[in-house]
Amino acid sequence: MTKLIVIKIGGQAISQLSTTFFDQIAQWYQQHYQILIVHGGGPMINRLTTQLALPVHKVNGLRVTDAATLVLTKLALLGDAQPALLAKLTQHHLPVLGLNAADNQLLTGELIDYRQLGYVGRLTAVNQVQLMQLLAHHIGILAPLALTETGQWLNVNADMAATVLAQQLHAEKLVLLTDVPGIIHHGNVMTSLSPQQAQQLIRTAVITAGMQPKVQAAIAAIQTGVKQAIITNAIDQPGTAIIQEVAV
């Protein structure tokens, strides 16, 4: 297992990051963790599609991505969301590096269902050697885009991308930032769950539809070797940890 932490940040969260976020990143970096941040850009994409009067359609939470929407997605992620996050981290004197799939074919993907989703894909390969070399000296800031083997760009769900990266890079920890402090049951944040317990809470609708994709991503990470997957609204807060075994 690599001393690596993979963090997923939504586009909305980029403008709302607190000082404690940067302090925690700095602390992990000083502790010699390699850090990879996968960022979304939903609000930035929505702003562009609205300005150009393009329709927005989603299927099972995935943005249907036609050719025009794909261009705007690349523009929003690589020209707006990523530079904004890089600027904030640089202001806190952190050594950062903006990354995307075209950097030595870092991320390879394939279409999920072109007829239903357009240019939406899943990751099929990660250039592990190149990426880990880059992370040896920098905090990586990676956009959730992939390239097919023939060079076609794909829009990839950021939670799914972060999960696959954590799996492929043998990360110690996956942190999925969201807008709630964790999985809430009877008014309290549940500190830890096993994958089996989490699935039961999904079946009984304790974990609602909006949270389910993140929980499923966390479960997938744990079941493929990631030691801990955390769902939280702040990286310095414990949130809910999905772990292999939970003490009774």
From Swiss-Prot:
Biological process according to GO: arginine biosynthetic process via ornithine; L-arginine biosynthetic process
Keyword vocabulary terms for this entry: Amino-acid biosynthesis, Arginine biosynthesis, ATP-binding, Cytoplasm, Kinase, Nucleotide-binding, Transferase
UniProt xrefs under InterPro entries: AceGlu_kinase-like_sf, AcgluKinase_fam, ArgB, Asp/Glu/Uridylate_kinase
Site (Transition state stabilizer): K8, K214
Binding positions for substrate per the UniProt entry: G41, G42, R63, N155
Keyword Ribonucleoprotein attached: no
Protein name: Acetylglutamate kinase
